[in-house]
Amino acid sequence: MSKIGINGFGRIGRLVLRAAIDKGASVVAVNDPFIDVNYMVYLFKFDSTHGRFKGTVAAEGGFLVVNGQKITVFSERDPANINWASAGAEYVVESTGVFTTIEKASTHLKGGAKKVVISAPSADAPMFVCGVNLDAYKPDMKVVSNASCTTNCLAPLAKVINDNFEIVEGLMTTVHATTATQKTVDGPSGKLWRDGRGAAQNIIPAATGAAKAVGKVIPALNGKLTGMAFRVPTPNVSVVDLTVRLGKGASYDEIKAKVQEAANGPLKGILGYTDEEVVSTDFLSDTHSSVFDAKAGISLNDKFVKLISWYDNEFGYSNRVIDLIKYMQSKD
């Protein structure tokens, strides 16, 4: 398997490393200009949300050493200056949240990276969602996006529903856990005034492009879905509410059966299914992109339904970053 570099050792960067270890992928380099290697050890070892790292982690001679494997550490602010080639990194995960366009992410190629995977939606890079549109990947693509955690939750469910019952139109709401861009107390937040309100005190209506992005990965749904978010005071795990009008009438039991069929078949490991009495913390560190909650959904009639699906917005997504890289490697 080709070797991976990670740019930005924040929530996603660190969890991509955990996911890589779980999946037997090789991370050989990490770049972060804001934390030194000793701080990396601390942040990787202790995690308030997912718990302590179960393996060994140490700093030795400037390297980050995880489970005995040496990882080269860079501290460059400009991606063009990161010497990925010296560490043997071919696939770079761009997880700073800053370099999200083809132009900006392409600077990694100057340092020897062969491919770049942006761990965020991108304005112009081709977007991929595992289980949905990987067949559209072409080896000549140098920079790709793994879309957003919410698009990764919504798209597999929307695919199953559209393939079987045809989505005429729909609205999505994500009830979304707090993320690092939010404020601990009220503060200025540019043009998005509500986003600057205290995260622990409020339910905050917010914009999200996740539903519209589904139209990019499932062209048949382009223009048929849009959505919004509520940011809520929980540290992790979010839930999508997809309310759709169907072209082909179906009972809620028929819908459940098709989702379960996909979860046990072509979308196994990506789309999950539960009929238990679950709540958000039951999905902490869940590796699925999306877990359909059979007991939470409702049907008004055979053509108008509300479907509910949970996701660990940090760890499920980080696992898909590695899955996307593995898929790319199989085709390159």
Swiss-Prot record:
GO terms for molecular function: glyceraldehyde-3-phosphate dehydrogenase (NAD+) (phosphorylating) activity; NAD binding; NADP binding. The keyword Cytoplasm applies. The active site is at C149. The keyword Transcription regulation does not apply. It comes from the Eukaryota. D-glyceraldehyde 3-phosphate binds at S148, C149, T150, T179, T208, G209, R231. One of its GO terms (biological process) is glucose metabolic process. It is found in: Cytoplasm. Keywords: Cytoplasm, Glycolysis, NAD, Oxidoreductase. NAD(+) binds at R11, I12, D32, R77, N313. Its EC number is 1.2.1.12. It is an enzyme of class 1 (oxidoreductase). GO terms for cellular component: cytosol. The record marks H176 as: Activates thiol group during catalysis. Coiled coil: none annotated. Its main location: cytoplasm. Pathway: Carbohydrate degradation; glycolysis; pyruvate from D-glyceraldehyde 3-phosphate: step 1/5. It catalyses: D-glyceraldehyde 3-phosphate + phosphate + NAD(+) = (2R)-3-phospho-glyceroyl phosphate + NADH + H(+). Belongs to the glyceraldehyde-3-phosphate dehydrogenase family. Homotetramer. This is Glyceraldehyde-3-phosphate dehydrogenase 2. It comes from Drosophila pseudoobscura pseudoobscura (Fruit fly). The gene is Gapdh2.
